[in-house]
């Protein structure tokens, strides 16, 4: 549902503004033309006082012309202002490289600069080559028993989320990790077993998303200080954060696709959302493993699996999705996000595997 807010404003404003402008213009031309008529063209009624009054009015024509011209100019300025207001979301989205999900990046030899990701601690942008094939591995319990580990590891780049482990699950989820996208709230979970996640993962790129004071670089937010300590503990560790501009871009995409402002609708974007965005930038072809469709949980007998493959016995996946989708505020919109991913799959080479389903 692209440009929903923008289109609504434009439709609301365009026709009334246009009609009012036309009416004012016609009225102005009519009044000015009548005032400028030569005296011999004024209908004679035999009433000299009427003709005298008309003559006096004709002397006021230049003043009326000036007044009407000023009115038209003022109204035109208001029109321009209202149109700019209506187009503001579209302009903002364009400035933030709005068309990323719909159009693939051009493939050029050599590394590319990705300015939406800032390294810790020097703040430099991410520089790397595109991945020809990517495996995006969901944390879903759908992965249990899949036996897809070797296929996942066969992709050029493997993307994982938060603290999802590989040890003990290699047969189903593989063991390679090229990029791990982490929520700022999940950083402490990785620190519980930091040697597993960081000590032997020098080839892994860590990208942390989050907003607010905890991620503040200037003031040294708590999460950012933790990331700094990690880079000191493990020299050469590749840690990046989403820039504020990139975070705003992700919010804007959500609004463009759903017609809802993320904050006003009480929504929190999931790590899955923040994983698909860089995947669209970094990958030429994407296979998403373990992600169900937006209609899966509304089917008669959906398969019951744990929300996370590494947390057995916890809340059922579909129960978690429904709980968040129906919550009035402070919730992830998992089902809504999956509907968006389905639309993206119509424009980009994205395939969903285990369960396998086609974009609608």
From Swiss-Prot:
Pathway assigned in UniProt: Protein modification; protein glycosylation; Glycolipid biosynthesis
A single GO cellular-component term on record: Golgi membrane
GO biological process, one term: protein glycosylation
Bilayer topology: Single-pass type II membrane protein
Record topology, Lumenal segments: 95-360
Positions of transmembrane segments: 72-94
Cell compartments where the protein resides: Golgi apparatus membrane
Family statement: Belongs to the glycosyltransferase 29 family.
Protein name: Alpha-N-acetyl-neuraminyl-2,3-beta-galactosyl-1,3-N-acetyl-galactosaminide alpha-2,6-sialyltransferase
Name of the encoding gene: St6galnac4
């Amino acid at each position: 549902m692209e440009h929903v807010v923008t289109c609504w404003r434009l439709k609301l404003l365009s026709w009334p503004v246009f009609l009012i402008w036309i009416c004012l213009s016609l009225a102005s031309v009519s009044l000015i033309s009548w005032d400028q008529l030569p005296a011999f063209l004024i209908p004679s009624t035999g009433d000299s006082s009427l003709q005298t009054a008309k003559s006096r009015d004709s002397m006021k024509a230049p003043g009326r012309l000036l007044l009407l011209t000023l009115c038209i100019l003022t109204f035109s300025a208001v029109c321009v202002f209202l149109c700019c207001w209506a187009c503001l979301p579209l302009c903002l989205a364009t400035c933030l490289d709005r068309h990323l999900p719909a159009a693939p990046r051009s493939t050029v030899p050599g590394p590319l600069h990705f300015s939406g990701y800032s390294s810790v601690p020097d703040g430099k942008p991410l520089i790397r080559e595109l991945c020809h094939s990517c495996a995006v591995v969901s944390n879903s319990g759908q992965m249990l028993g899949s036996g897809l580990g070797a296929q996942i590891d066969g992709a050029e780049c493997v993307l994982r989320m938060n603290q999802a482990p590989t040890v003990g699950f290699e047969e189903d989820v593989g063991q390679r990790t090229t990029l791990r996208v982490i929520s700022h709230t999940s950083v402490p979970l990785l620190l519980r077993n930091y040697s597993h996640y960081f000590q032997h993962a020098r080839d892994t790129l860590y990208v942390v998303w989050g907003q607010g004071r905890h991620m503040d670089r200037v003031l040294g937010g708590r999460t950012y200080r933790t990331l700094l300590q990690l880079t000191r503990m493990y020299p050469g560790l590749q840690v990046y954060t989403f820039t504020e501009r990139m975070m705003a871009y992700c919010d804007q995409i959500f609004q463009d696709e759903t017609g809802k402002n993320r904050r006003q609708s009480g929504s929190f974007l999931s790590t899955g959302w923040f994983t698909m965005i860089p995947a669209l930038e970094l990958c030429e072809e994407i296979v998403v493993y373990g992600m169900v469709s937006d209609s899966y949980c509304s089917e008669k007998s959906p398969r019951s699996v744990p929300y996370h493959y590494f947390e057995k016995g916890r809340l059922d996946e579909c129960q978690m999705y429904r709980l968040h989708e129906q919550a009035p505020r402070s919730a992830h919109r998992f089902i809504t996000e999956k509907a968006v991913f389905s639309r993206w799959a119509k424009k980009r080479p994205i395939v969903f595997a285990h369960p396998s389903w086609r974009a609608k």
